[in-house]
């Protein structure tokens, strides 16, 4: 099987995991970095930003020309687009006329745009062109089915080396609250409210200093790579907060925290209750007041009990296949259904 994946090749891109594990499974993959091409142009200088915003830039035309040329050369069995903000519907229609099945995976939502990078008209206008829509979000799956688009659930996952996990296990625990992520309006408001209720919290991310100023909030730069996993494991309480497009589901942190054996405090969504056992593998909250109570409860756990919860959620992650290698195996089954 030959799969053409269009998306990003930046270090944080989820498509990297599928490229890695599809190749491991024997699939020939071409990774076309459409989003990277756009951002490399847009972020190069102020001039490029002005030209793009004025509508005079040819960057998207160039990307779509390259998209078609690479497809012609690679001759894939399937085209898998991640999100698709840079790909014109006309380019997808061109591929469809060549009888190449089209698959989409959107790590945000094609229906709810919560920021500049979460969607655009290319995403909206391409929905009906896809033969298969993979999503982590059950509400999006339902909406796709009303539009007569075949849709399947493909949750987020984690990708953590065994040697790094073993190292993380040895890290001395800090009995404090941590939040890993960049600020948005809802996150800032919630964390400010926690601070007002005398909850001390360490936040890691970009630009937090612009939005919060409290003696109860300590701000650190974002962490990546191996350091990300070390920080995720290190704290007694890892707070997870949802965004407007995933308020009822789960996010990437849901399974990353589980995979490293972190003690996660997350909103009581349907997904979190489906994938984890409350009070045994995760702690859930419904509002600010219950979050504060849960924080106190978790911080007061005996170390032996805390370690038991860490062991439970790590074990659940392994037993139920929450890692990206298993997610890729599931995705591959769907891809095979398209061409057989």
Task: Name each region found by the language model.
Residues 300-335:
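A charged, aromatic-enriched C-terminal amphipathic alpha-helix characteristic of glycosyltransferases
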Residues 1-52, 58-66, 73-74, 82-89, ...:
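Nucleotide-sugar donor-binding catalytic core of glycosyltransferases
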Residues 282-288, 297-303:
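Conserved acidic donor-binding segment of nucleotide-sugar-dependent glycosyltransferases
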Residues 34, 107, 156, 286-287:
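Active-site donor-binding loop signature of nucleotide-sugar glycosyltransferases
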Residues 81-84, 95-102:
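Short, conserved structural micro-motifs that define repeat-unit consensus positions
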Residues 103-117:
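A short, histidine- and acid-enriched strand-loop-helix "catalytic/donor-clamping" loop
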């Amino acid at each position: 099987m030959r799969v053409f994946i269009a998306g990003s090749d930046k270090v944080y891109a989820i498509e990297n995991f599928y490229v890695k594990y599809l190749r491991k499974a024997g699939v020939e993959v071409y990774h076309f970095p459409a989003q990277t091409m756009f951002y490399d142009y847009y972020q190069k200088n102020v001039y490029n930003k002005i030209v793009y915003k004025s509508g005079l830039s040819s960057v998207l035309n160039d990307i779509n020309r390259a998209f078609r040329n690479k497809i012609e050369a690679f001759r894939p069995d399937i085209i898998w687009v991640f999100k698709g903000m840079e790909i014109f519907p006309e380019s997808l229609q061109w591929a469809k006329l060549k009888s190449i099945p089209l698959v989409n995976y959107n790590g945000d939502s094609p229906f709810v745009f919560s920021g500049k990078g979460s969607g655009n008209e290319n995403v909206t206008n391409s929905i009906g062109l896809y033969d298969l829509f993979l999503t982590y979000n059950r509400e999006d799956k339902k909406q796709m089915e009303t539009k007569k688009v075949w849709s399947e659930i493909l949750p987020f996952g984690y990708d953590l080396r065994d040697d790094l996990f073993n190292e993380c296990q040895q890290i001395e625990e800090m009995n404090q609250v941590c939040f890993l992520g960049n600020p948005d309006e809802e996150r800032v408001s919630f964390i400010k409210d926690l601070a007002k209720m005398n909850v001390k919290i360490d936040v890691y991310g970009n630009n937090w200093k612009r939005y919060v100023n409290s003696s109860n909030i300590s701000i650190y730069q974002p962490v990546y790579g191996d350091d990300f996993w070390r920080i995720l494991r290190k704290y007694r309480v890892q707070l997870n907060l949802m965004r407007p497009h995933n308020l009822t589901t789960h996010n990437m942190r849901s399974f990353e925290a589980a995979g490293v054996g972190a003690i996660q405090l997350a909103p009581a969504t349907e997904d979190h209750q489906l994938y984890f056992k409350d009070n045994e593998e995760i702690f859930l909250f419904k509002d600010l007041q219950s979050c504060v109570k849960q924080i106190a409860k978790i911080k007061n756990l005996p170390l032996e009990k805390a370690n038991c919860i860490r062991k439970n959620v790590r074990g659940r992650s392994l037993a139920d296949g929450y890692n990206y290698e298993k997610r890729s195996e599931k995705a591959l089954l769907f891809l095979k259904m398209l061409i057989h």
